[in-house]
């Protein structure tokens, strides 16, 4: 029977979800994850606890447009319209309601603490049985690890409690509500609450019970909290494990706590004590707490490089040794501190190779499973990341355990963001919102502070700087002085942060925004009185085809010790799978669900696609972050290790000298490099090739044995140097055959054997080529000065909000996309050994000349067509995206072969990871399937390209695919692209960089812009 105080009407009348002073009702205090083992050996080995029962699985679910629409009868029994959904899940992924993607703008009308009357509500119910022994003794708790955004809980028709903060557990005592036989849970989840105003993160806005639900049975007298910390002497040869244990229940003199420390099967230390701590003040000590200190000689230290872990088992027992319960956690002996302007781990200055990670899955929304978490960690480790920022909320509890075990440094961030407020600190400077903010910070610390991987606490993200931040900064520093605190809001260098932690500050360029200037990172270090380390909390915005200029950051990080790295934005594209009318899956972004407001494709900023397939930019990050650096002097390779703690023990250095991709000599040397040490490797006398070509020395560091995070043969580092080559002159082969030139009113036609070339005299273009009777071109060869806009080219510009400073808008305004060619010259001459076609075009828009292109085509007796191009750029037109040629080839070949930089896509400001070699890949691999189509697939530094029956030689960049730049520009999603007839070839003499410092302002560095007034390039085109 539902009591009147438990009724739905009473709960609705209170409107707890619109009261910032009510963040919970009856929720239990925060603590580290518990399992309440009743066997200490099971606790030591982390076996499943019989006292912890998962409630994940099928629940009954009914959706309503508002909480007032929920019938009172639902508290007693399932509704006829109820469906079955899997918990954990987001209800939007089951077709209820729509996910909303927005970055800054709140998805609801801003009127804190009030939310819309139309407040989608999900009603979950589950019927379950409880073990009889659980009812007879002890306490049974229910734990919701994550519910978005707020919920009320009933058990057997009786109201239990209320919780909000979607990213931390809400735990309730069910003991008084359970009964023998069947029990029924009813959970009413509201999409919007006053807490939503603190959760304005750049992500999909989804709802539901999206993390695990479990029951935990603890004894009446129980461990209610425990906290472990490690202390060291100066040289880390001796350590102390401090374990503070708190109990609740009936305090008896015979109660004891034993803390034992294990390394595998070996007990390292152990201590036992009764409750009653040290005297705190004139009123005495805590009777329900005790601190034990265990001495450890020569501890094996924890780091991301060598994640040594011990296991601490905390036993609550009687004086005669009878175990009441045990809790346990992994322990990493490590020390984090800031000293002399440097962030130190175990006394060594860290270089943060970090990335921001949202919890996202293309099929499951914000539900994380262990397989996905492990996959993310393995990919991060394999690509030389050593740190992750939990952007922008505490993650699933398992994530931290995995980071402890595999080795990643973690910035644990409170679930606070008020980016859409004006000003941003409207709530964070308001004392009425301090309780809500406080719970989000303090409960995060209380849950996660036992994890060695957590090396920095973060007060949240993009919430301005308010007095509440200062208060919470001081709380953390008082409760946990063992870790620094960072917070970017208010300018990245306020009194609420131990680390200067800007986002998107540039290496050398100041961005003097009012009140919150972003100085260049080099300048920031030298500001008067500034002594803190600088670690970018976000940098290198990896949206679409991006990460240009990444190497510039890493040059600065290695040059300035107090520039200690940063966290790339971000790890994974947040696209979601939808299905078309035929059941085919496609990747969706903001607006594709009818969601308003929305920020389109801005949710896709990842180094990996949503399915965790790497973007090409990930390879650039891997290369720049590699832990081995190389220098070549003569025939000596100097290898420097940037590992702080790890001596190389699983690395071979492979070296190879190749001429135009053909190996001439190679060798292998085991690496034996101490942490932060060097090794000199003497190469033998290198061969001197007799023929012309590019001579390259390539070194690769290979791991011969598999590790916890990589397979055998994993390449962790590499470098290339171009070596000096012998000078040689290649004389053209004499041919007694001269191509035949035929002139008509419309065309110049050149014929040589079974090959023909046709130039249209009215357009001045190479209009067709034949090999025998087969046409080779579907479109003429013409100049190209534009590209399908990248996200970085578009910036924040969109149909309803034009940003005139965006590259794409500047190109459009100047007429680059609309320019048409006016023929200035088209002549043909027969030379002694060749036919020469000379053309000139003025590319014009609205009567204004933007470019003048002059070309010569020299077709000789060998059938080669040498093309020389000279381009003049108008001084008052924006720098073009590219200067090159394009055509649609008739052939569709299976593979592409080239001599140049590869194998992955590379651009002028993102090519340090690419290697010069001869590459051969399927045509499909030349296209990068960015969800939002754009320019893609470029390969730079090309000396030779072979495709079908064609060959091109010179010094150029190219991309080749089934999609034209026009189609890429006009198509909103990759699944809407259609393979066109033939193959589109773009050959560029010059291509602008792609940028990537951020994606909302022009970020291509000056040295990678096409700012010259004249350009010259050449290439040779022949048929095989």
From Swiss-Prot:
Binds 2 magnesium ions per monomer. Binds 1 sodium ion per monomer. Mg(2+) 2 binds at residue 598. SMART domains: Bgal_small_N (SM01038). Keywords: Glycosidase, Hydrolase, Magnesium, Metal-binding, Sodium. Mg(2+) 1 binds at residues 417, 419, 462. The record marks 358, 392 as: Transition state stabilizer. The active site is at 462 (proton donor), 538 (nucleophile). GO terms for biological process: lactose catabolic process. Na(+) binds at residues 202, 602, 605. Substrate binds at residues 103, 202, 462, 538-541, 605, 1000. It catalyses: Hydrolysis of terminal non-reducing beta-D-galactose residues in beta-D-galactosides. Its cofactor is Mg(2+); Na(+). Its EC number is 3.2.1.23. One of its GO terms (cellular component) is beta-galactosidase complex. GO terms for molecular function: beta-galactosidase activity; carbohydrate binding; magnesium ion binding. It is an enzyme of class 3 (hydrolase). Gene3D superfamilies: 2.70.98.10, Galactose-binding domain-like, Glycosidases, Immunoglobulins. InterPro entries: B-gal_small/dom_5 (IPR004199), Bact_Beta-galactosidase (IPR050347), Beta-gal/glucu_dom_sf (IPR036156), Gal_mutarotase_sf_dom (IPR011013), Galactose-bd-like_sf (IPR008979), GH-type_carb-bd (IPR014718), Glyco_hydro_2 (IPR006101), Glyco_hydro_2_AS (IPR023232). SUPFAM superfamilies: (Trans)glycosidases, beta-Galactosidase/glucuronidase domain, Galactose mutarotase-like, Galactose-binding domain-like. Homotetramer. Belongs to the glycosyl hydrolase 2 family. This is Beta-galactosidase. It comes from Escherichia coli O9:H4 (strain HS).
């Amino acid at each position: 029977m539902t009591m009147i105080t438990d009724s739905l009407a009473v709960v609705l009348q209170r409107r707890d979800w619109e009261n910032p002073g009510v963040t919970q009702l009856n929720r239990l205090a925060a603590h580290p994850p518990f399992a309440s083992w009743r066997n200490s050996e099971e606790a030591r080995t982390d076996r499943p606890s019989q006292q912890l029962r998962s409630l994940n699985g099928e629940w009954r679910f009914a959706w309503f447009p508002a909480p007032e629409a929920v019938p009172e009868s639902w508290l007693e029994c399932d509704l006829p319209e109820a469906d079955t959904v899997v918990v954990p899940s987001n209800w939007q992924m089951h077709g209820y309601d729509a996910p909303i993607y927005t970055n800054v703008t709140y998805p609801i009308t801003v009127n804190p603490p009030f939310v819309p009357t139309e407040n989608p509500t999900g009603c979950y119910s589950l019927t379950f049985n409880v073990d009889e022994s659980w009812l007879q003794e002890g306490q049974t708790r229910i734990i919701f690890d994550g519910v978005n955004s707020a919920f009320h809980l009933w058990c057997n028709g009786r109201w239990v409690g209320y919780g909000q903060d979607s990213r931390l557990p809400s735990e309730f005592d069910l003991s008084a509500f359970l009964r023998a036989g069947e029990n029924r849970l009813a959970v009413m989840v509201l999409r919007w609450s006053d807490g939503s105003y603190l959760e304005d993160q750049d992500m999909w806005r989804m709802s539901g019970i999206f993390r695990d639900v479990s029951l935990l049975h603890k004894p009446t007298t129980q461990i209610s909290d425990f906290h472990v910390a490690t202390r060291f002497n100066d040289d880390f040869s001796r350590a102390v494990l401090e374990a503070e244990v708190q109990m609740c229940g009936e305090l008896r003199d015979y109660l004891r706590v034993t803390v034992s420390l294990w390394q595998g099967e070996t007990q390292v230390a152990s201590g036992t004590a009764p409750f009653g701590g040290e005297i705190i003040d004139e009123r005495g000590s805590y009777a329900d707490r005790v601190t034990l200190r265990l001495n450890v000689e020569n501890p094996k230290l924890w780091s991301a490089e060598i994640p040594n872990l011990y296991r601490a088992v905390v036993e609550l027992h009687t004086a005669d040794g009878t175990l009441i319960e045990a809790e346990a956690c992994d322990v990493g002996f490590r020390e984090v501190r800031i000293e002399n302007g440097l962030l130190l781990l175990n006394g060594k200055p860290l270089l943060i190779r970090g990335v921001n990670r949202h919890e996202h899955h293309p099929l499951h929304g914000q539900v994380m499973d262990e397989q996905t978490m492990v996959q993310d960690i393995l990919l991060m480790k394999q690509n030389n990341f050593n740190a992750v920022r939990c952007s922008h909320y505490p993650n699933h509890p398992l994530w931290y355990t995995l980071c402890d075990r595999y080795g990643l440094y973690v910035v644990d961030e409170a679930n606070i963001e008020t980016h859409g407020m004006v000003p941003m600190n409207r709530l964070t400077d308001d004392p009425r919102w301090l309780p809500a903010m406080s719970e989000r910070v303090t409960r995060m610390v209380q849950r996660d502070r036992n994890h060695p991987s957590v090396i920095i606490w973060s007060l949240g993200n993009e919430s301005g700087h308010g007095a509440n931040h200062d208060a919470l900064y001081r709380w953390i520093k008082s409760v946990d002085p063992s870790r620094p605190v960072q917070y970017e809001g208010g300018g990245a260098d306020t009194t609420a942060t131990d680390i200067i932690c800007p986002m998107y500050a540039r290496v050398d360029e100041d961005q003097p925004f009012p009140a919150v200037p972003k100085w260049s990172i080099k300048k920031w270090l030298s500001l008067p009185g500034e002594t803190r380390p600088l670690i970018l909390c976000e940098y290198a915005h990896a949206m679409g085809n991006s990460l240009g200029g990444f190497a510039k950051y890493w040059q600065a990080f290695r040059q300035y010790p107090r520039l200690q790295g940063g966290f790339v934005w971000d790890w994974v594209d947040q696209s979601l799978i939808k299905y078309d009318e035929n059941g085919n899956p496609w990747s969706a972004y903001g607006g594709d669900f009818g969601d308003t407001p929305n920020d389109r494709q801005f949710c896709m900023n990842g180094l990996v696609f949503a399915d965790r397939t790497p973007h090409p930019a990930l390879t650039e990050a891997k290369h720049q972050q590699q832990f081995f650096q190389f220098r070549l002097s003569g025939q000596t390779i100097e290898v420097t290790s940037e590992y702080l703690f790890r001596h190389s023990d699983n690395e071979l250095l492979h070296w190879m000298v190749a001429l135009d991709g053909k190996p001439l000599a190679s060798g292998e040397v085991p690496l034996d490099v101490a942490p932060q040490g060097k090794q000199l490797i003497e190469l033998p006398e290198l061969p001197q090739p007799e023929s012309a070509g590019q001579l390259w020395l390539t070194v690769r560091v290979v791991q011969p044995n598999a590790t916890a995070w990589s397979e055998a043969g994993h390449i962790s580092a590499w470098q290339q140097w171009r070596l000096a080559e012998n000078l040689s002159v290649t004389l053209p082969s004499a041919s007694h055959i001269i191509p035949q030139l035929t002139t008509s009113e419309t065309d110049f036609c050149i014929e040589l054997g079974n090959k023909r070339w046709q130039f249209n005299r009215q357009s001045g273009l190479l209009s067709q080529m034949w090999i025998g009777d087969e046409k080779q071109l579907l479109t003429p060869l013409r100049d190209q000065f534009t590209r399908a806009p990248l996200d970085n080219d578009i910036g924040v510009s969109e149909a309803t909000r034009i940003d005139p400073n965006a590259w794409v808008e500047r190109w459009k305004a100047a007429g680059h996309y609309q320019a048409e060619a006016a023929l200035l010259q088209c002549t043909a001459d027969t030379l002694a050994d060749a036919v020469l076609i000379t053309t000139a075009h003025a590319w014009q828009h609205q009567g204004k000349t933007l470019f003048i292109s002059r070309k010569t085509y020299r077709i000789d007796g060998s059938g080669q067509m040498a093309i020389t191009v000279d381009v003049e750029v108008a001084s008052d037109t924006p720098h073009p995206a590219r200067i090159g040629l394009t055509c649609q080839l008739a052939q569709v070949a299976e593979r592409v072969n080239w001599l140049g930089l590869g194998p992955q896509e590379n651009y002028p400001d993102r090519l340090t990871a690419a290697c010069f070699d001869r590459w051969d890949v399927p045509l499909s691999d030349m296209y990068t399937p960015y969800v939002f189509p754009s320019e893609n697939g470029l390969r730079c530094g090309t000396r030779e390209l072979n495709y079908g029956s064609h060959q091109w030689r010179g010094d150029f960049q190219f991309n080749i695919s089934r999609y034209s730049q026009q189609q890429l520009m006009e198509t909103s999603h990759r699944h809407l692209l259609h393979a066109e007839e033939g193959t589109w070839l773009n050959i560029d003499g010059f291509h602008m960089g792609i940028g990537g410092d951020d994606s909302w302002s022009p970020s291509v560095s000056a040295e990678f812009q096409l700012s010259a007034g004249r350009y010259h390039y050449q290439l040779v085109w022949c048929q095989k």
